[in-house]
Structures are given as C-alpha cells and as structure tokens.
Amino acid sequence: MRRVVHLFLALSMLTLATNSRAQRTNVVRTTVRQIILTLETDTDTFKRSLDHALDRGPLDGTRAEDEINDYVKQFEHATDKLKDRAEDNRYAPNLAREVLIRGRSINTFMRKHQLGGDAGNDWARVRQDLTLLAAGYKVNWRW
C-alpha cells in the first residue's frame, strides 16, 4: 500500500511538473507571437518614415536608396516567414536568427547614413523589438 501511495505521489508530481512546463511554454509562445506582431507594426511605421526621409534627402534616386529598400524588403519577408511559423505554434529560432541578421543590415545602413528624425526613432523601436525577439528565442545577439 505504501508503494502505491509513493507511486501515486510521484506520478502526481510528474504530471504537475509537465503541466507547469507546458503552461510556461504557452506563455513564451504567446509572448513571442506578440513580439512578432509588434515588430510587424513597428516595421511598417519605420518603412513609411524611411521612405519619407529617403524621398526628401540626398539619397533619393541613388544606389544607396535601392540598397536600403532591398534590405527592408528582405527583412519584411523574413519576418513574414517567422510570423507564419509562430502562428502555427512552431518554434523557429533559425528564422528568428534570419530576421535578426536582416535587421543588422538595416542597422548598419542607418548608422552609416545617419538617418535621424522619424526614421531614426522608428528604427530604434524596431531594434528594441528585435532585442526582445532574440531574448524570446534565446538567441545570443549583439548589434
């Protein structure tokens, strides 16, 4: 009888631990999905302010303008893939890493060309989102 009680207690503790782990996983997934949605919204805002800054600045019509537009397009595509994976509840650290790498290209451009104003502020928000994304996926990341 004592063995049965110990076995029951052990199974109960295992079940509780498993349920707790599952709940934590669901919280993490929900948080990561929210980060991705915020990232998309902030990226759209950044893209509009970047277009505005480029059209009214010395980079208008240059190869550099084409370059940053291509970086942003690739970044948005990678973010869309990550969002699709997150909506399917699939953990995708490699896609998160791709989004971060694409973001790094934009960051390098923004620093090199010193685009400030709304574009700079909006990019700073996107960078914060990316830092949260890296933490959510446990990706070691530095700018």
Model-derived regions: residue spans:
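Long, amphipathic, charge-rich alpha-helical segments that form helical bundles/coiled-coils
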Residues: 68-114
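Bacterial N-terminal signal peptides
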Residues: 6-15
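Generic structural concept
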Residues: 33-36, 40-43, 65, 69-76, ...
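N-terminal signal peptide c-region/cleavage motif recognized by signal peptidases
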Residues: 17-19
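Immediate post-signal-peptide N-terminus of mature secreted/exported proteins
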Residues: 21-69
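Positively charged n-region of N-terminal signal peptides that target proteins for export
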Residues: 1-4
